[in-house]
């Protein structure tokens, strides 16, 4: 016997979270909980403002329609990426397809004073991989900060994310301030330029490896082995169903590319599922899930080791 609940939620964000020039004051989303007999499965639907095609309200309408269809015996999935992902996660839990084992390691997101960062990163246990957002300030400053971190910590590897912020000239200004001897320890730089060809040229000219992120969601993108391209960053909330995520990971691995499962600032419930997906589909690759600290609370399922308060399901607004 099938049954379902849908919950709507809103989590206050820390001050200073800015996405594409917009301040994100709250993270808004939905949960779906599916039951079939004794089995239960949860999924999170949280379109990311400025990145998702669909709004929260559109996702809610699509989710409620899909849930009603599922209750009537339908087996299809919605079209909207965030709804397809959340619904497919709930089904994957319900049917036991999504393993319980999780990779709760996270490449820490580096913000703040570079000298403080050096101290923090130097004390990191195990493999030292960290993420730095670039393109928010002057390219020269970004280059100097990255160079400082790599110089101060000889076993540090950095993942950089420019979100297509640079012109080819600015990208070159960044590279100019990174010692060529350290560039191999830049694991990859996500989407340095707006145009893919400019990003490819940057990789060839500087020897700094790049990764595709936004490109994966463009209609003309195809998976190819290319000089200077080392990785793809997959954000399931923006991608679609779990099957589509699996297809993209498989396509990347077939070409020898690293596939990184990455957060779209999901709640703790969604992040714990992404940690399980990462352990399942990309074992051995550190996922990009260090975003919980941007929020003021957890919900339903806590992230191991987090001190943030965690709301229970009965504290959420139920829609169905």
From Swiss-Prot:
Keyword Disulfide bond: no
Keyword flag Nucleotidyltransferase: no
E.C. number: 4.2.1.113
Catalytic residues of the enzyme: 133, 235
Pathway: Quinol/quinone metabolism; 1,4-dihydroxy-2-naphthoate biosynthesis; 1,4-dihydroxy-2-naphthoate from chorismate: step 4/7; Quinol/quinone metabolism; menaquinone biosynthesis
GO biological process: menaquinone biosynthetic process
Molecular functions (GO terms): magnesium ion binding; O-succinylbenzoate synthase activity
Domain of life: Bacteria
Binding site for Mg(2+): 161, 190, 213
Cofactor (UniProt): a divalent metal cation
Protein family membership: Belongs to the mandelate racemase/muconate lactonizing enzyme family. MenC type 1 subfamily.
NCBIfam families: menC_gam_Gplu (TIGR01927), PRK05105.1 (NF003473)
Protein name, as recorded: o-succinylbenzoate synthase
Species this chain originates from: Salmonella schwarzengrund (strain CVM19633)
Gene: menC
